[in-house]
Amino acid sequence: MTRRVAGGVAVLVTALLSAAQGSAVPTRASAQSELAAGAFAPGMSERHHYVMSARVRPLLLFWIGRSNVGDAIVTRAAAPHEARYSLLIGSDPDRAPRRINRWGYIEEDIRGDAATVVGLMTESDEESVEEAEANLQREQGGRHMFKVIHASIDAEQSQSVVTAVGAPADYSFRQVRAVLALTSDAGTAGKTRVVRLPRGTRPGFLSALAETIHAQAESARAETLHPGMPVSFVYHGKLYELRSTSAQFKPTLEVNSSKYTRAVSAQFAVKNLANGEETRFSLSYAIDGRLAEVPLTISYQPRWWMQVNLALADDVDSLQMGALDR
């Protein structure tokens, strides 16, 4: 049982970051100005901490779950005609079964009609528990590889390249800056991908999601809640569409021991516009107060037998809250 949970956590974190990392994106100046204004006032900067739990279903009849196996940190900042979003997420080897260490990071920096994206994830394309176990054994033998994406975007096109980086140790998400520093020193870059952008393409998965949530929350505050319009973005040479498939108003929402009022629970789909493949996830957020439009919960199920959940835990003392500054 523990083996299944351990492998499942590894695959879950990798799958979530594969979707989230798909956020290297450009856009037009008008759309970027709207994003920079966003849902929060220019000059503001926010950081929120989440605790991760995971569930694996070895049989069709029941789930096996583990709580507090990792963390996530979401940041957002705004200035006139500028916006910055980041997501750091991963399992914590000090808490996860078998010291599972799977994590990733993405940062989107939008300035006027230009944007840059940096994404990082542990190199582990596991499709099964068995593959996860095999990768764990290789890592114990000294193989610690990461994939790092750098993208630059303007109003017309996106250029991105993935670099393979070998780390001297089994770095966790606490060492995100150390891994990024290795890229320029010892990385092996792949072929640069260049793609022309249709008008209205947004500058990243995170910024596209923030815009979608903002429009949805505005309709909820006006008591006319609706899912909203699809938003397109680009990732490493491919175009994607983000859309909310449904949204429900919640007078109250309980998350662990916390209770929130006036929240929205929404479901989303990300579609690869080239092949039609879809990735689905759900999240909830408050529509008023200091946590307005901040995700309270996030749930993602990449396989029928696995699910990862994040819950807001700003009140939990965590050393990981300072990880982005290291």
Which residues does each predicted region cover?
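Polar low-complexity intrinsically disordered regions enriched in Ser/Thr and small residues
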Residues: 10-11, 122, 169
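Bacterial N-terminal signal peptides
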Residues: 8-18
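Bacterial N-terminal signal peptides that target proteins for export
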Residues: 1-9
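Acidic, serine/threonine-rich low-complexity disordered tracts
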Residues: 25-163, 212-326
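Hydrophobic, aromatic-enriched interface-forming segments
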Residues: 176-228
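Mixed-charge (acidic/basic) macromolecular-recognition segments
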Residues: 134-199
